[in-house]
A protein has these predicted regions:
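Extracellular ectodomain surface segments
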Residues: 1-21, 281-331
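Blade-level signature of beta-propeller repeat domains, shared across WD40, Kelch, NHL, RCC1
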Residues: 248-280
């Protein structure tokens, strides 16, 4: 493709390769945060919501307390008010509910515990009782994040000892006494200390956050909720503007909001997503091989099945001018790099 172009926001990264639509740029932006001082963990490890976004739960990995907030406006952290704190007696790294909130799952570094909740999503101590505990240390001794597929027949964890995602089958939905380990996939190339895991609603995207990269990595799965299928890393969204030690995150129901928490600030951070469930994406420049080939001046004439080889590059602000560059090296501009 000759004289091709791509649009990128300041601070973003644009990547070009020889494949269809092979460009990426951040589409999530940090929008707001809310701090709760004494009514918030000092070592926050995860943030989750009830099914309609009117309740929020934030865990503390050091004390085992889980803080419950009401939200007067659904999925709006600025409307949160403290309700109570549940003492789990468990070093909480991550949390999840079943679909109606009558089961609550709490993960520490080696075990997951299932709780019965008599009134869905009401974590008042009198409503909560522990029922089952399962040990996961055979797969990883530092489990950090947990989530389920939609019907509760699969559970996924991420561990920081081996930097892998682990998949388990549940013969009875949302019953951890019936789990069996099935598979794993390494995410070490992107994160060497992962802290949480989530999927989009249809299970075709997986997200991993971690404290080494200080970002959230987005992956696609060729088969929904199946890590034995082709798992492809799409890119990452930096969290350094909201917390330099990110530990947990969640989405709202339609994927237009991302919520993160971490252990550097005592707060929950809210991020807006331009495209639902897309932390890295492109707009306006992905018509074909090597950014944009929609213009007749930019068409490449080889079939898409052919190999495209870049033999020379030049750097500069004007066409036909500039200095010779090295093929295979990143081009550094005022606002980022072209790789």
């Amino acid at each position: 493709a000759r004289n091709d172009t791509g649009n990128i926001n300041e601070g973003g990264t644009l990547t070009v390769s020889n494949s269809s639509n092979a460009t990426s740029v951040d589409t999530a932006t940090f929008s707001s945060s809310n701090s709760y001082s004494s009514q918030y963990p000092t070592n926050s490890s995860d943030v989750i919501f009830n099914d309609d976004g009117t309740k929020m739960y934030v865990s503390d990995s050091s004390t085992g307390y889980i803080y419950h907030y009401n939200l007067s406006t659904a999925f709006d952290v600025s409307s949160a008010s403290y309700l109570n704190a549940y003492a789990s007696g468990f070093g909480v790294q991550s949390m999840a509910f079943n679909n109606d909130g009558t089961k609550w799952f709490i993960l520490n570094t080696t075990q997951i515990r299932e709780y019965s909740v008599s009134t869905g999503f009401d974590t008042t101590a009198s409503n909560v009782s522990a029922t089952t505990t399962s040990t996961l240390s055979s797969q990883d001794s530092t489990m950090m994040g947990v989530t389920f597929n939609n019907d509760g027949t699969k559970m996924f964890t991420v561990g920081a000892s081996n930097d892998k995602v682990y998949e388990y089958a549940l013969s009875t939905a949302f019953d951890i006494s019936t789990i069996s380990y099935t598979d794993s996939v390494s995410i070490q190339s992107q994160e060497i200390y992962p802290t949480d895991i989530r999927f989009n609603h249809d299970g075709t995207k997986m997200y991993i956050t971690g404290t080494n990269g200080r970002d959230i990595n987005e992956y696609t799965l060729s088969s929904a909720f199946d890590i034995s299928s082709t798992v492809t890393h799409k890119g990452s969204y930096s969290l350094t503007s909201s917390d330099s030690y990110p530990t947990g995150f969640s989405f709202n129901n339609d994927g237009t909001k991302l919520f993160t928490t971490g252990q550097y600030y005592d707060r929950v951070n809210e991020h807006s997503l331009t495209t639902p469930f897309s932390l890295v994406d492109v707009s306006g420049e992905h018509s074909g091989d090597v950014i944009n080939t929609s213009s007749t001046n930019n068409y490449d004439t080889d079939p898409d099945s052919d190999t495209l080889t870049v033999t020379a590059i030049r750097t500069g602000s004007d066409e036909g001018n500039g200095t010779a560059g090295s093929v295979g090296s990143a081009l550094t501009g005022s606002y980022g790099q072209l790789t």
